[in-house]
Amino acid sequence: RSDSIALAAVDLDAKSARILSLPRDTRVEIPGHGWQKLNHAYAYGGIDLLRATVGKAFGVPIHYYLLVDYGTFPRMVDIIGGVDLYVPKRLRYVDRAGHLDINIPEWQQHLDGQRALHFVLFRHDALGDIGRVQRQQQFLKAALEKLKQPEYLSRIPELAKEVVAFIKTDLTASQSVQLGGFVKELDRNRILFSVLPGKPDYLKGIS
């Protein structure tokens, strides 16, 4: 099942982007499977069914996709030398069966690939999945800020080629390079991050 889902709209001419995070437990109609949690779509039919589900739910065509898994995410982060960000509270969670041990102290932190993965995965606090979505957006903003540093800015097209090697996508190689160039020119004030609004509820005893 997909843990993080976002719908992005990129305007190459206006040099702007909008990123809408979709909480994984959002109840939607999955074609052929009825009303279920959004993240079930990927489990049932992979990226094609997830794309169809999101497109139907929001009434927009999904032209392209980017898919990153747990194994490749840390390697992508390490390509840019990790990310610096502020952690407002300690993130601590242990799942021995799942071989997961998250322990990120409060305060300003430098996150390498593995710690960055733990940061975006953590959801064991009062905000649950919404808190995780907020941290994922915080991380993405910090990563974009890192790419704006002079030593990385000129290398964005080159880095884009490296990163694409770890991503499953239907973008062509030339489109990936074009996207890298777009990120290079993108002003942080031209990126709008938002989270799909909703309210928590229980259906047949399941949240």
Regions found by a protein language model. Name each.
Residues 1-207:
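Non-catalytic, solvent-exposed segments at the cell envelope interface
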